[in-house]
Every structure is written in C-alpha cells, then in structure tokens.
Amino acid sequence: MTKGKIITLEGPDGAGKTSVLEQLVLKLEKDNEQSIVTTREPGGVAISESIRNIILDVNNTEMDFKTELLLYIAARRQHLVEKVLPSLSAGKLVFIDRFIDSSVAYQGEGRGLNKSDIEWLNDFATDGIKPDLTLLFDVPSEIGIARINQNVNREINRLDLEKLEMHQKVRQGYLELAKANPDRIVLIDASKPLDDVVDEAYRVIKERFAH
C-alpha cells in the first residue's frame, strides 16, 4: 500500500490558499497516483466544526488569547484522531488547510503568546506528528486584506476584523517558520495570478514525492 502523507497549506489571511487547494487537487486527481483527502482546520469533523464556529464568531469579542489557542488545539486533536490518522492508515494523501504552523504564527507571533508553550501543545495534540510537506503561500499583508475586502462571497470572521499590524505579525511569524524549517516548508509567492500559484504548488509536490 502507498504510504499516506500529510501536506499542509499555510499562509496569512487573503493568501488564497483555499482557492489554490481546489484547483491543485483537480490537477493531482488527473494523475490518478494516490487517493486524496482534503480537510481544514479548525474543522473537518463535526466536533471540530462546532469549535470553529465558537472561535470565529464575530460576537465573541471577549475571547481571551489563551482560550482561543486552547480551542484551536482541542479542534486539532479531534480532527487528527477522527479524520487525519484513519486517512493516513488507508494510504491517502491528506491535504489540510491550516495545521500546527497556524497556531505558532497567529497565537504566537500575532497574539504574543509563548511559542514554546504552543509548540508543546501542538506536540501534545498531534502526538508529535508533523506534515510531510508544508506549502506556505506568502502575500504582503496589504494585498491580503484587500483581497478579503473584495471577496463578496467570503464570510467575514472574527480574525478578519483584526488591524493591519496583527496581519503583519502573522506574516512575519510564517516567514520565520519557513527559515527555521527549510526541509519541510516551501515558500510560494501567492501575489501572482491563481493559475501560476497552482502550477508552482503542483510542481513542488511532484518534485518532493517523485517515485
């Protein structure tokens, strides 16, 4: 049986990774090399989707930063056990829209929480499981925010309402993660047209997992 793998898509808000994932999977499915599962964080399974609704509710303005982090971690654990691990055991290629790096970038760099604590919580929730590959879609914060504001189909969530400074910190957190994990994280310029970004992501995956 083909070994299951985890590929995560990361990036600041407005990077377009969700749109990239849709097109990327279509290209990979045409190759018919491995069964593909796509999922997201927070969410992916019923319990985690319920937690997602709490986290992103625009009315929950009083949410403490540590509460926010712990909710993400709880959603991550349930999602991993209920969906990701069974998919890996079945030899599938699992694409996750956000995973452990989001917590470091958003709650660590963005919120200013202790990154060592976050890394410990990530390891606790995942039993130390890391992605086989992370595609980091990078875009300047101003462009990302402009994209969010222009997307009439996007449902605005609590994190979208943060000021520019928060988005800039998150981006910086991601760039630092890329420097610290060059073997796992591949940086992709997401300011380019969607088709170009999809092609680049496809190329990276094919090169990384060439038989």
Swiss-Prot record:
Mind listing the UniProt keywords for this protein, alphabetically? ATP-binding, Kinase, Nucleotide biosynthesis, Nucleotide-binding, Transferase
Q: What is the protein's known function?
A: Phosphorylation of dTMP to form dTDP in both de novo and salvage pathways of dTTP synthesis.
According to UniProt, the name of this protein is: Thymidylate kinase
Which reaction is this enzyme known to catalyze? Answer: dTMP + ATP = dTDP + ADP
Annotated GO CC locations? cytosol
Signal sequence range: none
Pfam families (alphabetical): Thymidylate_kin
Report the InterPro entries cross-referenced here. P-loop_NTPase (IPR027417), Thymidylate_kin-like_dom (IPR039430), Thymidylate_kinase (IPR018094)
- Endoplasmic reticulum is among the record's keywords: no
Gene (name only): tmk
